[in-house]
A protein has these predicted regions:
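Short, polar/acidic, helix-capping and beta-turn segments at strand->helix junctions
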Residues: 2-160
Length: 160
């Protein structure tokens, strides 16, 4: 469910229509709007729907779920859990970098797996990015992921 600011709800109908029709955020751009900054980079895949790659809201950075797509190509890095997890972590790293952060700033992640049997393999690849003080985390097995991905990971990071 979308959240609309109170000021936008009070705006004339034409302004609300113009807001809805606004062009998508340009790539490699940080845009300030309504107290938040949209973070976007072409070094990670474009969002598959009406959401941002990441949002800065004060010091927290919220990175949307990443799947193993190769940026600019729209295809998976491979068919294996290893290939897709490596690409997920590359995509997440690119978004963190665009926002001025890195994996050491990540405080929480959520991992979605198409098959819980991949838990150990994902942990090995994931753990290489967090060798000390890993973030809090939840992991779930789900029925289906976007584009039939094998893994999706989102994160929250803290910015200095």
């Amino acid at each position: 469910m979308a959240t609309i600011s109170a000021s936008l709800l009070r705006a004339p109908a034409q302004l609300r229509a113009a807001h809805r029709a606004a062009a998508p955020v340009a790539r490699n751009l940080t845009v300030r709007a309504m107290g938040k900054e949209v973070v976007a980079t072409d070094k990670a895949p474009a969002a598959l729907g009406p959401y941002s790659q990441a949002i800065k809201a004060g010091n927290p950075l919220y990175v949307s779920g990443q799947i193993g797509l190769i940026p600019g190509e729209g295809k998976f890095a491979g068919d294996t859990i290893e290939e897709q997890t490596e690409q997920v972590m590359k995509n997440m790293g690119a978004i963190l970098e665009e926002a001025g952060a890195d994996f050491s700033k990540v405080v929480k992640t959520t991992i979605l797996l198409a098959d819980m049997d991949d838990f150990k393999t994902v942990n090995e690849i994931y753990g290489a990015r967090f060798p000390a003080n890993p973030p809090a985390r939840a992991t779930f097995a789900v029925k289906t992921l976007p584009l039939n991905a094998l893994v999706e990971i989102d994160c929250t990071a803290y910015l200095d």
